[in-house]
């Protein structure tokens, strides 16, 4: 339900949408406020034919403003019966496939972004933002000859940053169909440059904080709720100190400290695998954090005497 102004009730009232008739009806007086409306969202009901093919949706997917004509098109389907109609339909279908589709490459790119997003468990808003970034880059007609997989992965990386749900380059790389971290990094710089030229100013990427990765990293290590809470508090306190390490490295080092103070200690190798940070980098970050552990680690999680049991770097 939603609210709309009813001319009979003379005020905002709740309205009901009658999908079968396409009418918007006032829930209080029954006045039809709008009739024969078209629902542009997907229709999930399917209508089977007798040919044994997959059930087609009668309306199909919602319109996509990034595609020509909103992505809406006419498809010549096979007839249910046999005879000459089937020959005519198949002939028309071949001609349709031969026709130029300006969005064919774009649709394939969007499918690839959707697949990568699904594999990383990203929300739809990030996928849509990545699609928008890719479309803007493609409209400039300057990306030919570049690694397509790296370009799409970089669009997804930037979208995650802009939606305040950052992922590490290594995480993006794991679903990038073979594109390397170096290639994705180059593609990211290229996209930022192109979009900056388009807008006339720098592209806002969003600020990365160590806490952005903490819950996911802890989940990868199957840490208990108490340890996760302590790690989140510790990484937040660490921002008060001038620790010149990347947020991801700080997150990994904090996890190492928290697990060393618990009964469920995690080997450095496991933390490295879960966070994508090299063991040597974690050690160096731990060395920088060590002088501040008494102020970083929550008192409810570890006492002063517990902190003395930590290994000196």
Swiss-Prot record:
What ranges of residues constitute the TFIIB-type zinc fingers?
2-34
GO aspect biological process, one term = DNA-templated transcription initiation
CC annotations in GO: nucleus; transcription preinitiation complex
Q: What is its main location?
A: nucleus
Q: Where are the sequence repeats?
A: 116-193, 217-291
Annotated S-S bridges: none
Q: One GO molecular function term?
A: TBP-class protein binding
Q: Which PROSITE patterns does the record cross-reference, listed alphabetically?
A: TFIIB, ZF_TFIIB
Amino-acid positions noted as binding Zn(2+) in the UniProt annotation, renumbered to this chain:
6, 9, 26, 29
Q: Does the keyword Iron-sulfur apply?
A: no
**SUPFAM superfamilies attached here?**
Cyclin-like (SSF47954), Zinc beta-ribbon (SSF57783)
Q: What are the UniProt keywords, alphabetically?
A: Metal-binding, Nucleus, Repeat, Transcription, Transcription regulation, Zinc, Zinc-finger
What subcellular locations does the record give?
Answer: Nucleus
Transcription regulation recorded as keyword: yes
Q: How does it assemble?
A: Associates with TFIID-IIA (DA complex) to form TFIID-IIA-IIB (DAB-complex) which is then recognized by polymerase II.
What does the UniProt function comment say about this protein? General factor that plays a major role in the activation of eukaryotic genes transcribed by RNA polymerase II.
In the record, the note on similarity to other proteins reads:
Belongs to the TFIIB family.
Name this polypeptide is given = Transcription initiation factor IIB
């Amino acid at each position: 339900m939603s609210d709309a102004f009813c001319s009979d009730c003379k005020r905002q009232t709740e309205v009901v949408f009658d999908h079968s008739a396409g009418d918007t009806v006032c829930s209080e007086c029954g006045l039809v406020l709008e009739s024969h409306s078209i629902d542009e969202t997907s229709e999930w009901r399917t209508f089977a034919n007798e040919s044994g093919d997959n059930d087609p949706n009668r309306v199909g997917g919602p319109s996509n403003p990034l595609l020509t004509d909103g992505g809406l098109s006419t498809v010549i389907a096979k007839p249910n019966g046999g005879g000459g109609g089937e020959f005519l339909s198949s002939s028309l279908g071949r001609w349709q496939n031969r026709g130029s589709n300006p969005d064919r490459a774009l649709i394939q790119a969007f499918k690839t972004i959707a697949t990568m997003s699904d594999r990383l468990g990203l929300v739809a808003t990030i996928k849509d933002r990545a699609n928008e970034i890719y479309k803007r880059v493609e409209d400039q007609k300057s990306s030919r000859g570049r690694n397509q997989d790296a370009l799409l992965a970089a669009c997804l990386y930037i979208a995650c940053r802009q939606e305040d749900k950052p992922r590490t380059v290594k995480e993006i790389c794991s679903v990038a169909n073979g594109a390397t971290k170096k290639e994705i990094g180059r593609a990211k710089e290229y996209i930022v440059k192109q979009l900056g030229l388009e807008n006339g100013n720098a592209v806002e990427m969003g600020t990365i904080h160590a806490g952005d990765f903490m819950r996911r990293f802890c989940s990868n290590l199957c840490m208990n709720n108490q340890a996760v809470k302590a790690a989140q508090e510790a990484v937040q306190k660490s921002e008060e100190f001038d620790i010149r390490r990347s947020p991801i490295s700080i997150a990994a080092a904090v996890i190492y400290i928290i697990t060393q103070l618990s009964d469920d200690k995690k080997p450095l190798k496991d933390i490295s695998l879960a966070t994508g940070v090299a063991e040597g980098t974690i050690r160096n970050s731990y060395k920088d954090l060590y002088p501040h552990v008494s102020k970083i680690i929550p008192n409810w999680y570890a006492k002063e005497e517990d902190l003395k049991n930590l290994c000196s770097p």
